[in-house]
Amino acid sequence: MTSKFFFISNKVKKFSKTFEVDGDKSISIRWLLLTSQAIGISRAKNLLRSEDVLSAIECLKKLGVKIRLSKTECIVFGRGINGFKFKKNLVLNAGNSGTVGRLILPLLIKSPYKIKIIGDKSLSKR
């Protein structure tokens, strides 16, 4: 079986859109992970502040993503696809978030270094 790779070579035009969603843990985590892969600044108002969402933020910060969190807004300075910057033998703590553990893995696939994802006792049993 042959594998074919393709790359998107056309630049996407800069755009500015506002989306309103309910404060949902799953959506908040996915938004953080997606915007970490964008180039530029992404903002979310009233992002959910659950333990799982905060675990996602800490994991992304360890991967070199700059994130500013205030009482009303979260700002992510995206690094682009495969733009993470980190040291060898990195350990990411997903806490109790299976969503963070599962969804961050594909973003790390191109890393030349070993990255260990850990969690609390509950997550480690899953």
Each language-model region and where it sits:
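Short, structured segments at the rim of ligand-binding sites
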Residues: 1-126
